[in-house]
Amino acid sequence: MVKMRDKILGSVFGAVIGDALGMPTENLTKEEIKKLYGFVDSYVEPKNYLAGKLNKGEWTDDTEQAICLIKSLTKEGIDIKKFANCLIAWKNKNPPDIGLTSLMAIDKLENNDYSGVDSSSCGAAMRIYPLGIVFHNNLKKLKEEVIKASKITHNNKTAIAGALAIAFFVSSALKDRKDFSLLDECYNYIKDIDEEFAKKLLEIKNFNNLDYIYDYFGTGVKTDEVVPSAIATYLLTDNFKEGMLKCINAGGDTDSLASMYGAMAGAYYGFKNIPKEWIDGLKNKEVIFELAERLYHLATE
């Protein structure tokens, strides 16, 4: 099963590399990115709000939360208490890039309140890919676990539907599927959670130009902007590098956009098709190798 291992490594590294490549351009417009960096195609020192807080090649809260998810997973599903405790420990280190929704939700978790926050930001979708890997062969179980893992911070129908969509596309990529018919299948998979958002994903079929897509859906932090844009980037490009470069130069919530794209594209193209310089330049990659191996064993045992 070399191929499956390569795909799972690809998904995990794709997500983390996307996060680290997109970190310096996060919260900037397309024009500001051009002015500050030119065209970004490698790791650069951040000149945005993370300047002096993170260094080039480092990841953000997107990956920190995904790591907590991976550490709390068993083949039976997610240990919610363990996941909550990991998020609390991470928050208490005062990370420079924690989102407001996550901060509020984790404060509630500290008081044993698991009801989450009613926010449609993409915090659930950005961390969800490990579930798409482990439960790629059981969509019913995948749905249950995604809802459970999302609700404790983002108790909002659009946030949950967006997380389900990303997990669905990751699971499909591991099965070598990447085509527009997946949009209809995804619609059927998530419409009971948020039909309006599910319909929005179907609109991706109307486009063949990513610049138009980013203008139409947006690339901001809201789930109904960044998730359709990430899925569209994945479906409309045909190699890992091309889609990644689009994401990190798009403006907006670039680290989440690129991370979600990377999780899907990495699962489809595999680790061997990720540019070597992006793997080499990633900080603390041995941690990511270990976590990817853990997911591989959970997904295949």
Curated annotation (Swiss-Prot):
Keywords: Hydrolase. Disulfide bonds: none annotated. It comes from Methanocaldococcus jannaschii (strain ATCC 43067 / DSM 2661 / JAL-1 / JCM 10045 / NBRC 100440) (Methanococcus jannaschii). This is Uncharacterized protein MJ1187. Belongs to the ADP-ribosylglycohydrolase family. Its EC number is 3.2.2.-. GO terms for molecular function: hydrolase activity.
